[in-house]
Amino acid sequence: MIKREIEICGKMVPFRSSATVPRLYRAKFKRDIFKDLSKLESSYTGKKSEGREFQIEDLEIFENVAYIMAYHADNTIPSTIEEWLDQFEMFSIYEVLPQILISFNVAHP
C-alpha cells in the first residue's frame, strides 16, 4: 500500500493506492483502471513532449483516478467527483498527474 500527500492549490490532499483501488475504480466507473492509466500515461508523455493539451476524455480519466485514490485515503470526502473538485481552484494537471502515475508505478521519476 502506498500513501502520499500531494499539494493541490496549497492544500495537502491524501492519496492512497493499494490492491483495493482497481476494485473501487471498477465498481464506481465500470472501467479497468490499468487500461485507463496506461492510456493516460501515454497521453501525458506525448502531450508534454509536444507542448499540447489533454483531450477531455484524458482529463476525465485523470479526475476519476485522482478521486478514487483520494477517496481510498479519506472516505469522508464528497461523494461525487464534481463536489470533490469544487473544493480546489484551477490547478495544473501536469503538476499532479506525474505524482499519481508514480504512485501506481505506471511512470518512473
Label the model's feature ranges.
Residues 21-29:
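Covalent nucleotidyltransferase core used to form phosphodiester bonds in nucleic acids
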Residues 1-12, 31-52, 60, 72-109:
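Charged interaction scaffolds used for protein-protein
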